[in-house]
Amino acid sequence: MPCCSHRSCREDPGTSESREMDPVAFEDVAVNFTQEEWTLLDISQKNLFREVMLETFRNLTSIGKKWSDQNIEYEYQNPRRSFRSLIEEKVNEIKEDSHCGETFTQVPDDRLNFQEKKASPEVKSCDSFVCAEVGIGNSSFNMSIRGDTGHKAYEYQEYGPKPYKCQQPKNKKAFRYRPSIRTQERDHTGEKPYACKVCGKTFIFHSSIRRHMVMHSGDGTYKCKFCGKAFHSFSLYLIHERTHTGEKPYECKQCGKSFTYSATLQIHERTHTGEKPYECSKCDKAFHSSSSYHRHERSHMGEKPYQCKECGKAFAYTSSLRRHERTHSGKKPYECKQYGEGLSYLISFQTHIRMNSGERPYKCKICGKGFYSAKSFQTHEKTHTGEKRYKCKQCGKAFNLSSSFRYHERIHTGEKPYECKQCGKAFRSASQLRVHGGTHTGEKPYECKECGKAFRSTSHLRVHGRTHTGEKPYECKECGKAFRYVKHLQIHERTEKHIRMPSGERPYKCSICEKGFYSAKSFQTHEKTHTGEKPYECNQCGKAFRCCNSLRYHERTHTGEKPYECKQCGKAFRSASHLRMHERTHTGEKPYECKQCGKAFSCASNLRKHGRTHTGEKPYECKQCGKAFRSASNLQMHERTHTGEKPYECKECEKAFCKFSSFQIHERKHRGEKPYECKHCGNGFTSAKILQIHARTHIGEKHYECKECGKAFNYFSSLHIHARTHMGEKPYECKDCGKAFS
């Protein structure tokens, strides 16, 4: 064999020239495909391959002469050009540029067939990298040249019968060999018989799993400096590196969104054009990408080949199994630097970041509402269309989302697959388990900026925020009542009251006072006013209540908690209803009007109480003295005259009161506060009632008349004293002389 005279063979490895020309074999930097694999690639995948190979050619410096970009583009744009002449031309270029002295014979026609995988025996080997690079029969070299712009790989071969046809109705491809048709059919069935033992990923081709295993073994020539993964080809290494650098060189011209791969961009562009080339033969549903189509096919087959070793749950995809396994391992690879919170899924992490920044990139065209994630936006869109695809077979209830439907089904089955490792308590959803976990750790990482209250989850913090903003985004279409939580709206819509309100029907009648009610629940609560049943007891003072809401409200009198604050004057209240009523003092709104006298009220309860002044109804009767009252609150205050209970104590003078209103008036005396001023004389008073009584002295009005003599008085107390003169009653006696006075 003649001595190789190429300069890279002759020069000393230590010279500067040899250091500059660091040899790289083309088979190391090219992606290797078999013919069967190539025929299964779609146009976008072939174009991606073409771009990668172009980049590889441009960067390749192992051959003494650079390959012209212009020529490369020309080869790709002319796929029908003679493959034989193309190979011979490249061989001649290399021969002319090198001086290795090797001879090359003409390559026979059958050696230029794509199925050939070994170099032609007529091509003599050479120890120099230039000769090794020729590799005419090598599939890596062949494939590097035959990238196309949309033409099928087999268009390069114009000869030979193709007896094997694909049986799929929408695929008319034909093949020369039976293995090729079997491989093609896997693309339709989704069959991937080759599974990786390390990560579980599956492949259609045996060659694909061999390439994939290089990443795990670390035997690849090109190792990633970020994660240590190894690759057998330089092009795959470059593409992988983008996952770390975040480089997205392919940008959508319509919306500006960027992508790591050109194939992904092409799939994305279909969302703008509406093109869905992959159609399901069973339900006619169409998809943008082949991967989405294959995933959908499994929904018809019911196939779930990937099973969790911990709980036995099965999944249709390996990615779903991997995500599920994190619920058992507790692994949270995505960490928020701002709050230090770990998240199991990338999509959850991205949504979490947007929630903290306030970014809502998904806008509803109908109502303008913004959303943090595409999934939330898609769910919201269904509220406008009314679409509910998932229907429960047991109760007929329908849902927008499959996840909501699955969660609902567990109510019927009683299934609670998420179990707390500390206390054994089980839950229907992973999110419920995560929130519950905070009860053991005591961790509440989400703090309200308004009041400092902390919560276990961001959703709880968001919902709490509405108590400060007063936001009630969920409104009943029937009665207009608004709610802070969608759950409360759903409960409201299911109530009998809501159903019967339009007709005015009140089928539940009290046998004692004959009052009517829309719902059984309201009726049962009312019955307790007659029976005196109070099952909810305060742990601090022992006071009992008819319903748990009343107990919760009462407990705030002990804690002093007033979470509902007026934005106009800063006054705080124990309940949202009290805040709403108070806000009407600023707006002057009085929506509840008496039909008999036209008097208006700021709250419904005051209208109801007022209505009894017309009817004379007093349904609340004292069991000790038989005295009756128009409202339950008046009865409760009266009962304290029998029990002697005075729960409201002044901290200044320790005087106690049975009524909260009396306690408030008393406190004003200590502060010197007199907010009610007389328009006639300018005098100030501690309460509105005292002002009303005083006003009578100016207008001469005397409401209280003696039935015995007809004398009239401004005040009830004056009439009461006067009445004693008729009865001869003198309750006040002097201790010194014994004289009595009325």
Swiss-Prot record:
What GO terms describe the biological role, i.e. biological process, of this protein? regulation of transcription by RNA polymerase II
Give the CC-aspect GO terms.
nucleus
Q: Pfam families from the entry?
A: KRAB, zf-C2H2
Q: In this protein, which residues make up the domain named KRAB?
A: 24-104
Q: Which PROSITE patterns match?
A: KRAB (PS50805), ZINC_FINGER_C2H2_1 (PS00028), ZINC_FINGER_C2H2_2 (PS50157)
Residues in C2H2-type zinc fingers run 194-216, 222-244, 250-272, 278-300, 306-328, 362-384, 390-412, 418-440, 446-468, 474-502, 508-530, 536-558, 564-586, 592-614, 620-642, 648-670, 676-698, 704-726
The record's annotation in CDD domains points to: KRAB_A-box
- Where in or outside the cell? Nucleus
InterPro entries, A to Z:
KRAB, KRAB_dom_sf, Znf_C2H2-type, Znf_C2H2_sf, Znf_C2H2_type
Record's keyword annotation contains Metal-binding: yes
Q: List the GO molecular function terms.
A: DNA-binding transcription factor activity, RNA polymerase II-specific; RNA polymerase II transcription regulatory region sequence-specific DNA binding; zinc ion binding
Main localization (coarse): nucleus
List all Basic and acidic residues biased stretches. 8-20
**PANTHER family from the entry?**
RIKEN CDNA 6720489N17 GENE-RELATED, ZNF44 PROTEIN
Family according to the record: Belongs to the krueppel C2H2-type zinc-finger protein family.
Q: Sum up the protein's function in the record's words.
A: May be involved in transcriptional regulation.
Name of the protein described by the UniProt record: Zinc finger protein 700
